[in-house]
Design a protein with these regions (language model features):
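Charged, low-complexity intrinsically disordered segments
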Residues: 1-133
Length: 133
C-alpha cells in the first residue's frame, strides 16, 4: 500500500490517527472496540494475553495492552476513543491517561487543566460568550 506524506505528520508531540498510522493497529483497535460489551471486558480481565491472541494482537501492540501503556498504544495507531473503553472500566481515568501521554503525574495534569481554566469567563466574553476551541 502507498501512503502520501502530509505536513501534519511532523508536528512535535502529535500522534496522527490516519490510515497510515492505524493500518497496522487494526487488530488492536478491533480488540479495544470490543470493550463496548460487559461480556468482552470480563473475558479480557480473566486472561488479557489470551484475549489479545483471540483478536490477533501481537508484538508491540500486545505488550502495550498488557502493560496498559496508553501512550504506546496511541503512538502505534490506537483510536483514542476506543482506548477509553479499555481504560475507564479498569479504574484509569481520562486524566490518568492524559498525564501518561504527557509524561507527568495525574496531579500535575489536573493542575494544568485547572490553570487553563483561569480567566475562562473573560475569554468567553471576548468571543461573544461561546467557545469553539
Amino acid at each position: 500500500m502507498t501512503w502520501t506524506t502530509h505536513d501534519y505528520e511532523n508536528i512535535p508531540g502529535t500522534y496522527v490517527f490516519d490510515g497510515k498510522h492505524s493500518y497496522g493497529a487494526y487488530p488492536l483497535n478491533k480488540l479495544l472496540f470490543s470493550f463496548n460489551t460487559e461480556e468482552c471486558r470480563t473475558e479480557f480481565d480473566a486472561d488479557p494475553a489470551a484475549y489479545c491472541d483471540k483478536f490477533g494482537v501481537e508484538g508491540k501492540y500486545k505488550e502495550f495492552v498488557l502493560k496498559k501503556d496508553f501512550l504506546g498504544m496511541l503512538r502505534a495507531g490506537a483510536n483514542i476513543y476506543f482506548m477509553a473503553k479499555m481504560a475507564i472500566p479498569r479504574g484509569t481515568s481520562v486524566q490518568d491517561a492524559g498525564a501518561q501521554f504527557q509524561g507527568i503525574t495525574t496531579k500535575e495534569f489536573q493542575a494544568k487543566l485547572l490553570a487553563k481554566g483561569d480567566g475562562l469567563v473573560e475569554r468567553l466574553a471576548k468571543r461573544g460568550g461561546y467557545w469553539n476551541g
